[in-house]
UniProtKB/Swiss-Prot annotation:
Its cofactor is Mg(2+). This is Fructose-1,6-bisphosphatase class 1. Its main location: cytoplasm. The gene is fbp. The lineage of its organism: Bacteria, Pseudomonadati, Pseudomonadota, Gammaproteobacteria, Alteromonadales. Belongs to the FBPase class 1 family. Homotetramer. Mg(2+) 2 binds at residues 112, 115, 277. HAMAP family: FBPase_class1 (MF_01855). Keywords: Carbohydrate metabolism, Cytoplasm, Hydrolase, Magnesium, Metal-binding. One of its GO terms (molecular function) is fructose 1,6-bisphosphate 1-phosphatase activity.
């Protein structure tokens, strides 16, 4: 059995240019994950569930666990001294670490410290999403905004953690997507899913159908296509939507399927955040053989961010399913005008 730490070191040795900094950052994330996982498992016993009454920059009421997880990941990353700054869904602005070691470091981290946190009090799976970039500013100085506003193609690593019936960490550094499952008796992550690959086609679609009347016409047509009876294409497909991006994404990655969060009448730019959610998940999905676009044949990772909390439509999953919904989006786009 290979542990996450051993696997990271193994891959570091396979890259002559590696210096160990990225491995150290992943180690910090692993440590923070263990702390958050422990406290999520105690969420009903201690006062860390429920809303704070405070809204984040997106106008969403923050959960107590959101802020706790945010603090845990920030502290773990700052303590390693390999990151000059962090941008988080829970922070209005990026956070610059001004310790001398941090200022001299080459990397920044962007994260959603606790995805799906509103589900905690009903015991539904939640997750953490992260991505790592090389800073573009000069080391030796504090991080700047431009260090974080980079297209997803510049990611050097991305991953997510799902806190479910078992806790699993999935990550990529551009050489495949790999999954590690936590042994709760030891608190150790072991390699359980090496070189994960999503099927080219699937039979699961994940979308909040309660918003159907607000969807673009192409998405409505695709949903009807998914629900039609057709033996040769194994339709109707199965609708599965948890309301936690990490949970829906993880299931579809393993079984084959598509996750859709389109633009709507009430959210014309989409709802998911490009930097904290879409880019890292797109990197993981592409490394597993899938696709991630904005529904209009634009690759998510090629979009140029203009602000930290930018939102985009998100279509992600098995390549043939993404191809199909994109074709329908294009075919029926004229009906939106």
């Amino acid at each position: 059995m290979i542990t996450l730490g051993e696997y990271i070191i193994k891959k570091q040795h396979e890259s002559p240019e590696a210096t160990g900094e990225l491995s150290s950052i992943l180690g910090a994330i692993r440590l923070a994950t263990k702390v958050v996982n422990r406290d999520i498992n105690k969420a009903g016993l201690v006062d860390i569930i429920g809303a704070t009454g405070v809204e984040n920059v997106q106008g969403e009421v923050q959960q107590k666990m959101d802020l706790y997880a945010n603090d845990v990941f920030k502290a773990a990353l700052e303590a390693r001294g390999e990151v000059c700054g962090v941008a988080s869904e829970e922070e209005d602005e990026f956070v610059s670490f001004n310790d001398q070691r941090c200022i001299n470091s080459k990397y920044v981290v962007l994260m959603d410290p606790l995805d799906g946190s509103s589900n905690i009090d009903v015991n539904v799976s939640v997750g953490t999403i992260f991505s790592i970039y090389r800073r573009i500013s000069e080391p030796g100085k504090p991080a700047i905004l431009e260090d974080f506003l980079q297209p997803g193609t510049e990611q050097v690593a991305a991953g997510y953690v799902i806190y479910g019936s078992s806790t699993m960490l999935v990550y990529t550094t551009g050489y495949g997507t790999h999954g590690f499952t936590c042994d709760p008796s030891l608190g150790t992550f072991y390699l359980s899913h090496e070189n994960m690959k999503i099927p080219d086609n699937g039979s699961i679609y994940s979308i909040n159908e309660g918003n159907y009347l607000k969807f673009p016409q192409g998405v409505k047509k695709y949903l009807k296509y998914c629900q039609e009876i057709d033996g040769p294409t194994n339709r109707p497909y199965t609708s599965r939507y948890i309301g936690s991006l990490v949970s829906d994404f993880h299931r579809n990655l393993l079984k084959g399927g598509i996750y859709i969060y389109p633009s709507t009448a009430s959210a014309p730019k989409g709802k998911l955040r490009l930097l904290y959610e879409c880019n890292p998940m797109a990197f993981i999905m592409e490394q597993a053989g899938g696709r991630a676009t904005d529904g209009f044949n634009r690759r998510i990772m090629e979009l140029t961010p203009t602000e930290l909390h930018q939102r985009v439509p998100f279509f992600c999953g098995s390549s043939k399913m993404v191809d199909k919904v994109e074709a329908m989006m294009e075919e029926y786009s004229s009906e939106e005008k």
